[in-house]
Amino acid sequence: MVKILVLALVFSLAHAQDFAELQGKWYTIVIAADNLEKIEEGGPLRFYFRHIDCYKNCSEMEITFYVITNNQCSKTTVIGYLKGNGTYQTQFEGNNIFQPLYITSDKIFFTNKNMDRAGQETNMIVVAGKGNALTPEENEILVQFAHEKKIPVENILNILATDTCPE
């Protein structure tokens, strides 16, 4: 099974530069972080994806999402700027360095490192999809990424059902 996961990762990374699959409507399925407080309900980094666009050969990635604060959905759009190492940088609740790691036609696994204004670092994994839950194979990939990022498995939250924000 590990060989399958490695092959899936290699395949997805080899095709990661074909960002056409990234564009369109997306929903946050799962979010995980080494700092659970940041992604719990009402947490500043618990975001619900809505749309991704790429510009300038995807050197700029625009992500539109909602954050729920005080039971109110707040729509936000950020633009990530591609860095030389394949990561993107943007500002939201501090500085964020993110990267799409695993891409299929209906799922995207992102890693994100957030450094908030107080200097606290939070390592995250965000899985966006077209509305379907993770398959058992995708869940194994998620758990593997969580181990690599030192994110406890119990900090993996399925949040698709808690998304009450507008389309």
Curated annotation (Swiss-Prot):
InterPro entries: Calycin (IPR012674), Lipocalin (IPR002345), Lipocalin_CS (IPR022272), Lipocln_cytosolic_FA-bd_dom (IPR000566), OBP-like (IPR002448). It comes from the Eukaryota. The modification Pyrrolidone carboxylic acid is found at Q17. It comes from Mesocricetus auratus (Golden hamster). Pfam families: Lipocalin (PF00061). Keywords: Disulfide bond, Glycoprotein, Pyrrolidone carboxylic acid, Secreted, Signal. It is found in: Secreted. Belongs to the calycin superfamily. Lipocalin family. Residues 1-16 form the signal peptide. Acts as an aphrodisiac pheromone, reliably eliciting copulatory behavior from male hamster. This is Aphrodisin. One of its GO terms (cellular component) is extracellular space. Its main location: secreted. Disulfide bonds join C54-C58, C73-C165. Glycans are attached at N57, N85. Expressed in the vagina, uterus, and Bartholin's glands of female hamsters. Secreted in vaginal discharge. Gene3D superfamilies: 2.40.128.20. One of its GO terms (molecular function) is small molecule binding.
